[in-house]
Each structure stands twice: as C-alpha cells, then as structure tokens.
C-alpha cells in the first residue's frame, strides 16, 4: 500500500474545504494536500486508539461510542462533545424512524384490514340487493 492509498481522496478534502471557506476563497493544491495529510493522520490517530480499546475488549467492530471514548481519552474534549451530541441526535432520529415505521406498518395493516372489511361489506350489500331484485322479479 502506497502513502497515497492511505490518504483521504483529495477531491473530497477539497470539496469540504470549499464548503467551509467563503465562496470567493482560493485553495491551492498545496493547501489541499496538507489538509489531506493532516485529516488522514487525525483519523488514523483516533481510530487506532478506538481499535485498541476494541481489541482489549475482544471486539472486532469499532462503533461510534468507541470513537467518542478515544477522543475523550486523547484529551480532544471539544471533538468528543461534538461526537457525543451527534451520536445522541443520530440515535434519537433512528428511534423515531423505527417508531414511525412501526406505526406506519401497524396502521398500514389496519388500513388493509379495514379495506378488506369494507369490500366484504360492500359485496354483502350488493349480493342482498341482487337477491332482492331477483326475488322481486321472480314474483
């Protein structure tokens, strides 16, 4: 694996820089490469700490809580606070989405059941009308 292979994609780094800086700002190739190297190193540093924690706990998957823990352990409290808030919001949104989907499925089934009942009722009424008509015309 070459050094370039381990770096974040330069296009993504440049796009993020453009989003953060004023629209009239110019970004040199050297600036993009420097941020690319720093951001890659930062991510590796934090991920390595989180990965070591997982290894000690005999786990193979690094999760958001591990990243939060690593940031806190490394003394990067501002980042840890931001990640903690993000994790909380993410989990809340997931919980709401799950509840909404569960509610939609339940009400969807209820609607389907109601529709079936309505069709059956309409069919029964139609049959009665037809039977009445038949018996009336038979007289």
Swiss-Prot record:
Residues 116-125 have a biased composition (Polar residues). GO terms for biological process: regulation of DNA-templated transcription. It holds the Pfam family CBFD_NFYB_HMF. InterPro entries: CBFA_NFYB_domain, Histone-fold, Transc_fact_NFYB/HAP3, Transcrpt_fac_NFYB/HAP3_CS. GO terms for molecular function: DNA-binding transcription activator activity, RNA polymerase II-specific; DNA-binding transcription factor activity; protein heterodimerization activity; sequence-specific DNA binding. Residues 8-14 bind DNA. Residues 90-115 have a biased composition (Basic and acidic residues). It is found in: Nucleus. The keyword Transcription applies. Expressed in flowers, siliques and young rosettes. It comes from the Eukaryota. Residues 90-139 are annotated as: Disordered. Heterotrimeric transcription factor composed of three components, NF-YA, NF-YB and NF-YC. NF-YB and NF-YC must interact and dimerize for NF-YA association and DNA binding. Belongs to the NFYB/HAP3 subunit family. This is Nuclear transcription factor Y subunit B-4. It comes from Arabidopsis thaliana (Mouse-ear cress). The gene is NFYB4.
């Amino acid at each position: 694996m070459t050094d370039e292979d381990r770096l974040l994609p330069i296009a993504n780094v440049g796009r993020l820089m453009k989003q953060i800086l004023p629209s009239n700002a110019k970004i040199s190739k050297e600036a993009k490469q420097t941020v690319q190297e720093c951001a890659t190193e930062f991510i590796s540093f934090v991920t390595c700490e989180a990965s070591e924690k997982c290894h000690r706990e005999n786990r193979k998957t690094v999760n958001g809580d591990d990243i939060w823990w690593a940031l806190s352990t490394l003394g990067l409290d501002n980042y840890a606070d931001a990640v903690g808030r993000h994790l909380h919001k993410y989990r809340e949104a997931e919980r709401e989405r799950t509840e909404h989907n569960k509610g939609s499925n339940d009400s969807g089934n209820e609607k389907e059941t109601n529709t079936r009942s309505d069709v059956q009722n309409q069919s029964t009424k139609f049959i009665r009308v037809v039977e009445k008509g038949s018996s009336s015309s038979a007289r």
